[in-house]
Regions:
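Active-site "cap" helix and flanking loop/linker of ATP-utilizing ligase/carboxylase catalytic domains
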Residues: 1-60
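Short, well-ordered beta-strand elements within core beta-sheets of diverse protein domains
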Residues: 36-38, 84-92
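Short, glycine-/Ser/Thr-/acidic-enriched flexible segments
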Residues: 40-44, 71, 93
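Extended hydrophobic-aromatic, low-complexity segments
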Residues: 46-49, 76-78, 97-100
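Generic long, charged, amphipathic alpha-helical segments
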Residues: 50-87
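Short, well-ordered alpha-helical segments
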Residues: 92-107
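Short arginine-rich
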Residues: 104-118
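A cross-kingdom feature marking charged/low-complexity
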Residues: 121-126
Length: 126
């Protein structure tokens, strides 16, 4: 989320072994704070439950993106398929603001038995 430049160009140059071309690329970064909160399945880590329906995912926007990890589609139904199911990532001017954005998005997500830490970023603001 913080990299504004085209990551594809960087990866393509590296894959082609054109490392001299990498020095000509200017990487532009978003200077805002990035914060990510992982939603884990019920029973994680020892025995994560699979097959729970996931609903209420917020639309991705410039300040918040939901990354999928342990998810699967069954037709049009999104289901949990592993321990770490989603990562809600937020960008904001401060850690406190990023926390508010991320946890507001998490409040919209419906995943039975989901668990997540409520203290992400807390040490940075203490």
């Amino acid at each position: 989320m913080r990299l504004k430049s085209d990551l594809g160009l960087v990866l393509l140059a590296g894959a082609k072994g054109e490392f001299s071309g990498l020095s000509s690329l200017t990487l532009e970064w978003d200077e805002r704070v990035a914060l990510g909160v992982v939603l884990a399945a019920h029973g994680y880590p020892a025995n994560p439950r699979k097959g729970d329906a996931i609903q209420g995912l917020p639309a991705d926007g410039p300040d918040c993106v939901v990354f999928h990890a342990g998810t699967a589609l069954n037709g049009e139904q999104l289901l949990s398929s592993g321990g770490r199911v989603l990562c809600v990532s937020a960008l904001a001017a401060s850690v406190e603001s990023a926390q508010q954005v991320a946890y507001a998005a998490i409040a919209q997500i419906k995943l039975p038995g989901a668990q997540y830490r409520s203290d992400i970023g807390a040490r940075a603001v203490a």
